[in-house]
Amino acid sequence: MTPYIVILSTGSELTAGRSVDTNSGWIANQLFELGWKVKKIITLPDDPNLIFKELEALQSLAKEIPVLAIMTGGLGPTEDDYTLETVLKLTGKTSYAVEKAKIRLTKIYEARGKDYKDILPTVFRQTNVPEGCKTLDNSVGIAVGFIESLGENSYLVCMPGVPSEMTEMFKRRLVPELKKMYPRENLIQKTKWLWNIGESLFQNEFIEPNREVYFKETEWGVTANRGYIKCIFQSTNDVMLDTILKSLEKQYPDLISDDVFQYVHEQLLYEKWTISVVESCTGGLLGKKLTERAGSSAYFMGGFLTYSNEMKSNLLGIPKETIETFGAVSDEVAFAMVDGLCLKTGTDFGVSITGIAGPEGGSEEKPVGTVCIGLKEPNGKIKVHRYLFPGNRESIRENASNTALFLIYQSLKGKVV
């Protein structure tokens, strides 16, 4: 059974443009990976009448077809949080406090001191849910999520709008419930990443020529990221999926990868190798990404942010003449940066990044987006790669740090870097 899926994000900060709705896109992508397609995404202000009108329309639609509505926001403690109130009006139910959540909230606020303890009665509303609903525990925050029936095989899911709370609740609490509510046939999913290639080029080069051969019974989707695209293929035919992946690997042998971030983490742990970084234009982004997973302290030894030429010379021992002759953004300086880094840290792997992130600083010879990435491997070999990344400052920095991780991935895979 496939429901008609609608995502609703509530919050006047969203409709006023003060905040960006990241929840809807994230939920839609998660649902696609589970084999479901979203039909509509709606953004609403904190207006109980507008919210009620949309929910009432979905309740009416649920009389004809299965509907799954997923709503985020409006479960907080303030007077502009209308989700529970609106759902109670829609269903004609009363609410009750989830005792476990109420006890947890009490402990948290009492620990914060008298001022917080005094406002407990007003914040208890976050623990209230409709009678008879399925509750969704909040392991990160306070507000309790819930699943309310909209009719036969139709449901309204309400979750907090805080992204960290919503994502954890979705993955740990909601997904198991969705699989019970809407059992799927044995859908198989395969995912690959392709580097330095855009969505449109991928569709033109791979999807269109193979549409009649591969994609009559296989769903596909692409998520664009900085430096790579994430390609997802879904089918009940595992043989067809394997054929598609083999064809993909044949066409893009040097650009294809699995989840780079996870593989680098797991492989560095497995091999007991260490790594250090020296960054200029990326300002620590690579170090941040290498340390996002628990356990990274086993392999990440540290790094340097050598933004100025003086720091490059003083910390890494790069001759000033080298910088003056070739420029701070050059193959020669990227080589010297990673060489000096590994002399200091003694790590198995070393990575250097130097570039022009813009918007100023570019030239005809080295335009904005020029980035040099140096990689030292455990065998002592150093190779420098030069790129010209598109986009604004943020995009160039993200492209550079992600591509550096891809180079580490390729080296760990034993590919020629």
From Swiss-Prot:
Family annotation (InterPro entries): CinA, CinA-like_C, CinA_C, Competence-induced_CinA, MoaB/Mog-like_dom_sf, MoaB/Mog_dom
Protein name, per record: CinA-like protein
Highest taxon in the source lineage: Bacteria
Family as reported in the entry's similarity comment: Belongs to the CinA family.
Organism: Leptospira biflexa serovar Patoc (strain Patoc 1 / ATCC 23582 / Paris)
